[in-house]
């Protein structure tokens, strides 16, 4: 293998939405990855729809497109 061309592959801790944790290996730059949605909370697996807006993205979208609509 060529040296210095591959990303750093190291152990990280993945934190699920319920607070449980597990360790895996990844090229993710941080030491810990906190999930906003996972198989325990995803609507496709639970059958329950819930709205998740962790970074204000939904509010930003609604503000940007508030006046947008089909005009008759």
Curated annotation (Swiss-Prot):
InterPro entries: Ribosomal_bL28/bL31-like_sf (IPR034704), Ribosomal_bL31 (IPR002150), Ribosomal_bL31_A (IPR027491), Ribosomal_bL31_sf (IPR042105). The lineage of its organism: Bacteria, Pseudomonadati, Pseudomonadota, Alphaproteobacteria, Rhodospirillales. GO terms for biological process: translation. Belongs to the bacterial ribosomal protein bL31 family. Type A subfamily. Binds the 23S rRNA. Part of the 50S ribosomal subunit. Keywords: Ribonucleoprotein, Ribosomal protein, RNA-binding, rRNA-binding. Coiled coil: none annotated. It comes from the Bacteria. The keyword Ribosomal protein applies. One of its GO terms (molecular function) is rRNA binding. This is Large ribosomal subunit protein bL31. HAMAP family: Ribosomal_bL31_1. One of its GO terms (cellular component) is ribosome. It holds the Pfam family Ribosomal_L31.
């Amino acid at each position: 293998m060529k040296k210095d061309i591959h990303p750093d592959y190291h152990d990280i801790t993945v934190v699920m939405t319920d607070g449980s944790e597990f360790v895996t290996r990844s090229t993710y730059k941080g030491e810990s990855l906190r999930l906003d949605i996972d198989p325990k909370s995803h609507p496709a697996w639970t059958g329950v729809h819930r709205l998740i807006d962790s970074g204000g993205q939904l509010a930003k979208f609604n503000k940007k497109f508030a006046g947008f609509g089909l005009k008759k």
